[in-house]
């Protein structure tokens, strides 16, 4: 909003935005062996990052769910956490299942924080 406190055309439009859709279907514990790494995942994790995450997982545990597309079974966020869970023999991992098209999946891969 401008300093004068008056709404301009651009701020008035911003207030009339459409409500965001909730694409989350459910949260559940899932066998990590059933989850599929996304074939278009471009993020590579260096050894120090993997070691740091492993140390945090050992000391703290799970604090964030992995995100998986219900339609394809592809992991959208949490590839490294799943890799570590498989290496450590975890039988379940916390997962948020979402409902996205394959095009939306690719957009999520490009925009989620690494």
Named regions from a protein language model:
Residues 2-100, 104-114:
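Short, charged/polar connector segments at secondary-structure boundaries
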């Amino acid at each position: 909003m401008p300093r004068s406190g008056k709404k301009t055309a651009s701020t008035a439009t911003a207030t009339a935005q459409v409500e965001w859709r909730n694409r989350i279907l459910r949260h559940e514990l899932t066998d990590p062996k059933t989850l599929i790494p996304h074939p278009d995942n471009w993020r590579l994790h260096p050894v120090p990052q993997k070691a740091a995450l492993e140390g945090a997982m050992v000391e703290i545990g799970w604090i964030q769910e992995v995100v998986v597309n219900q339609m394809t079974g592809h992991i959208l966020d949490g590839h490294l956490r799943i890799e570590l869970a498989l290496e450590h023999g975890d039988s379940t991992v916390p997962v948020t299942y979402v409902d996205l098209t394959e095009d939306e999946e690719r957009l999520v891969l490009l925009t989620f924080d690494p």
